[in-house]
Amino acid sequence: MANQVITGIKETAQSITGAARPWGDFLDLSAFSFPSSIADATTRVTQNLTHFRINYSIILSILLGLTLITRPIAILAFIAVGLAWFFLYFAREEPLTIFGFTIDDGIVAVLLIGLSIGSLVTTGVWLRALTTVGFGVLVLILHAALRGTDDLVSDDLESPYGPMLSTSGGGNDGARGDYSGI
């Protein structure tokens, strides 16, 4: 049983860190420049937050962990809440069932958010954690606005119009589409 838990934690951790973009790309100083307009900055923030979302999450988690290092009870609560998130939300493949009732993932997320906030308030570090997360988000948005997006791979920057802009033809007859005559 314990071996299965450790294996599950390892696999999920490798999956999460494997999804992170290379740190060399994240910190590439030659990719930084001032945006030409507010619209350009907004586009950069949106694209960089999408592209580097795992990197940003890792940085915020480390900052939050370092903030709590002076309060041992807060660290224990942080670990317990982190494990609850891991086992009840991230590492589950089948729906959560309690006493024969299937619990929706949205309800699980709301309950875990409540547990997270409750543990921050109970341990007395909510203001410190809120300040750290606020500062971290500000720095990450600044990074996202200043880092250019020209060199990013567009595999996760899909057009919201999807296949409507396809030029492959795909059996369609140009602008007419795939209509049959009357």
From Swiss-Prot:
Residues 163-182 are annotated as: Disordered. The chain crosses the membrane at residues 68-88, 107-127, 129-149. InterPro entries: Prenylated_rab_accept_PRA1 (IPR004895). Its main location: membrane. The modification N-acetylalanine is found at A2. This is PRA1 family protein D. Expressed in hypocotyls, roots, lateral roots, lateral root caps, columella cells, leaves, shoot apex, stems and flowers. It comes from Arabidopsis thaliana (Mouse-ear cress). It holds the Pfam family PRA1. The gene is PRA1D. Belongs to the PRA1 family. It is found in: Endosome membrane. May be involved in both secretory and endocytic intracellular trafficking in the endosomal/prevacuolar compartments. Keywords: Acetylation, Endosome, Host-virus interaction, Membrane, Transmembrane, Transmembrane helix, Transport.
